[in-house]
Amino acid sequence: YWDDACQASILGLTFGANKNHIVRAALESMAYQSKDVLDAMKQDSQINISSLKVDGGAAANDFLLQFQSDLLQMPVQRFKTNELTALGAAYLAGLSCGYWTHEELGVDLQKEFVPEKTSKEMDQLYSNWKKAVKTCQSYK
C-alpha cells in the first residue's frame, strides 16, 4: 500500500484491551502484510507458492507463524539457522563458483506450522484487515 500519506492506527480496541492485545495486533498485521506481498508475487509471477520459509527475529514467535500458516493456508517452516538470508547469499556464492553442488546444501527444519483454521475463518479476518487499511487510507 505504498501510501506515504497513510498514517498507522490500531482499530477495534475496547476499554478491555491491554498490552497483549496491542502486541497481537502488531503480529497479526505482519502476517496480513506478508499475505498482501505473497498474493502480489503470485499474481505477477503466475507461480504457485506452496510453503513459506521464514527466518529472522520474528520467526521465533510461534503465534505469528501459526497465524501466518492459517492465513496463507500453507505450511510455514522455521529452520534451525535463524539468519537464512546471510546463509543463502553464501550458498549462492559457493554454487556460482563451483565450491559445492545443490545436493550438498541442506538446512535443518526446526518446526513446521500447518493450517489449523479454515480458509473461511481466515478469509473473514483478512476481509476485515482490508477494510481497516482502506479506513486508514481515507484518514489524512
Per-region residue spans from a language model:
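Glycine/Thr-rich phosphate-binding loops that ligate phosphate moieties of nucleotide
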Residues: Y1-K140
